Structures are given as structure tokens and as C-alpha cells.
Amino acid sequence: MPRHRSGPAPSAARHSVRVPATTRGRVLAGLGMAAAVVFFLTTVPFHRNWFDLHVYYGAVEHWTGGDPIYDYLRPGTHYGFTYPPFAALCMLPMTLVDWHSALAVSQLMNVAAAAVILHVCLDSVIRRESRHRWFAYTAAACMLALLEPVRDTVSFGQVNLLLLALVLADCRLLTAGRARFPSLGRLAGLGIGLAAAIKLTPAIFICYLLITRRWRAAGVAIGTASGATLLAAWAAPTASRTFWTEAMWNTDRVGSLAYVSNQSWQGMLARLTEPFAEPSRAVWAVGVVLLLWLWARRARQAVAAGDELAGFALTGAAACLVSPVTWVHHLVWLIPALAVLADKGLRADPGGRRRRRLLTWALVSYAVLCSSMVWLWRWNDGGAPGFLGANAYVWMALFLLLLLPLGEPGADRGGPYAQSGPYAQSGPSATMGLCAHATASPSPSVPVSWLSEQPASPTRPGSKPAPSGSAG
């Protein structure tokens, strides 16, 4: 099948960011960007010293030595293994190598996961916007590495990038997979199921498949998650019983809910009431119900508009908000939303207000998520301004859930990510982007309400401390 392009070939006359004209210049610029990022990452005073990877490594060694895995605590702390038993089975190979080898493999897996994330989020926009794909990917990789959730995931030795890559692989299969690789398209849901079996948070993406009527993919995801969980129950019955009946419900294992790193709705409530009282469970529950209602409504709109990446982005934002514990490194789930913002801005009418607003919002959101600003109020003592600043990432996730633009009026519907789901009869193809180095290809624009827009006439058929925290 021939490969389609979304819009005309990029034009040098429309580039909004100049790139070096020669190959040598681009190579030098790419090396310069990479060197600057490496220098920053090796000197910034927020490295987490592989804390969570130490927990994983120590826990599986403790387990293979004959002791209960959920009894393990890292020496000098009260933090232990908090993941389901299937995750422990996946980590067993670490016991075959020494610590430094395990660390090296962990970082290589993070690099591979980042490559998948960049490809799913950026491939179509880079094809549309840039003549120099490798240079655009280099710049995007440098930008990705500077995000605080990515920095924390890497320096904690966390698994969040791997989980996001698994989930986004299903996003790709739900769009391009079915059109270009039908046999692979039938595997959609496999990545979400594996991610949900490793960690509970990605299970919300199974709900996303259900509310958007992707029955086959939802069945694959549920079957995969259930099969992995049953495999763990067969291989480690005692650990499975302990996790599902005790460890999962013990919130003391993950740290203080009021700690500033907990950037969830529950964390915000806990900081609001600390130290005078516990946050109201009723208020938390009402907020969660409202957030889930809003998410379900907007996710259906995204799929009706053929905008699969936006649907996944909304689900990631909702996951960050409704989870009782959303440490800063969990906020990698907001990366697809940044991609959608940038791509929609680049597609908007050049010189128009909507373009400026969307690109400004994307840049401000990116800067905030790089800034580590919440740590300025880590002791929750800044009054009203401190409350606003300490919850900066909560506000960001909420704004993205409320206002993320959906669909693309006038976009080419035959591109590499064309939607083939239940709402594919109307709405433009999904477009993906996080950063680009040129203005968008011209496309018709329609009046919209500030930033967000409704899909076009869809036709539907029928506490975790900074240097040391829980391995959560």
C-alpha cells in the first residue's frame, strides 16, 4: 500500500525555525544540543540515585532468597516493592546479573521506550513539517530528556517510559496498524494489557477502549492482563495473595499523600487539609466521578473526530488526576497531550490567533513540566500562592483534560494514522506531534472557541521523597 502524506511537502519558505543549511551544520548542531542536554542532566541537583531500581533489585533478590517479596524494605527506609506479582516476575532476570549490569540494561530499555514514544507521537508531524527527519528527531529527543517526569523516571530507575511505550504501541495499532498491517492491528490491546498487569494505573486505558467501543482491542487487553495476573498467581501464589489482599491496600507503603511530589487530585486535597485533618473521602470521590465523566465525554469526542492520539492523551491526563498517588515521574502520561497541542498549533492557520494560542500553550506547558517548580513549595508553607504553585502539575493536567483541542478541520483523512475504529465514518485523521521545526502545511481553518473545539458532525453507528521514595 502506498504511503500517504498529510498535506504537501514541507516548504523552506514556511519554516518558522531555521535549521543549518548543510549536513555538516546539522550534525554539529545536533551534537551541540545533545552535549548541552547531557551536561545539564549530569549537573542538575535533582538526580534520584536510582532509588527505585535499588528497591526492585533488592526486592527480587530478597524474593529469590526465599523471603516474601512484599516484606522487603530498602535498608534505612520504609519503602518496598509495591507492584503486582507479574511485575516481579518480569524483573526476575535482574538476579542473573550484578547491579551495574542491571542498571545498564534498565537505561537501555528506557532509551528504546523513548524511541517508541517519539515515533508514535512525532512521526506524522515530522514527515509533514521537516525535510530533515533525523535532525527533527534529535531535537525532539533532547526536549523529551529535559522534561522533569522523564528525568525522574530515568534517575529513579523507574518503569514509566516502558509502560507509556506499551500503551502508545496500541495507539499506533488502532490507527495505522489496521490500515497498513491488518494482522498486527488485531493485536491492539496487547500493550495496554501488559502495562496494566505490571502496574495498575494503565488499566484506565482498558476503560478507554470500552467506552469508545473498541470491543476487540478491549477484549485483547482484558485477556492479556487477566492471563498475566493468573500466570503470576500460578507461579507465585503466596505473593499474589499477599498483594491482592494486603499490600495493594496499604497506603503507608507508598509514602505521604500530602507530599508535594503527589500531583493528583488526592494529593491536592491532602495538602489543602494538612496538618489539621485527613482529606475528605467523599470530596475526593465526588471529584473523581466528575473527572471521569468529563474524561469519558471528551474521549468519545476525540475518537468520533478520528483523533486517536488525543483520546490517549486525555486518558493519560485523567489517569494522573484520579489516581490516589501520582508522583512527578508518573506524569510521563502527559507527554501525548503536549504532542497533540503542538501538532494542532502547527496545523492551524499560519499567523492566526488560534495558532499562536495553541503553540504558546504548548511551550508554556512544556516549560512548566521541565521547571521542577513544585519543589519550591515542598514544605507546604507558602499560603495561597504556595498552594497554587505546589499543585502546578495538577492544574496542568486539569487544563489539558478540559481544553485539549480535538480533531483537525480540513485535515487530510488518508494519512498514515487514519482512523479505522467504530467512529471512522467522519472526522479527520489523527495527527501526532510534540515539536517541529517548521510551520504547518496550510489547511482550511474554521472559527473555534478559544482553544478547544468540538468534532465535526460525527456519525456514529448504533509520599514519595525526592532523593528517596517508594518504588511506585
Predicted segment positions?
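Hydrophobic/aromatic-rich transmembrane helices and adjacent perimembrane loops
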Residues: 328-343, 394
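Transmembrane helices and adjacent periplasmic/lumenal helix-loop junctions
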Residues: 192-209, 323-330
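Hydrophobic transmembrane alpha-helices
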Residues: 98, 199-202, 337
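Aromatic-enriched
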Residues: 342-417, 430-438, 447-453, 469-472
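Primarily membrane-embedded glycan-assembly and transfer machineries that use lipid-linked glycans
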Residues: 2-186, 212-328, 344, 385, ...
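Intrinsically disordered, low-complexity terminal tails and inter-domain linkers enriched
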Residues: 4-16, 130-132, 176-184, 348-353, ...
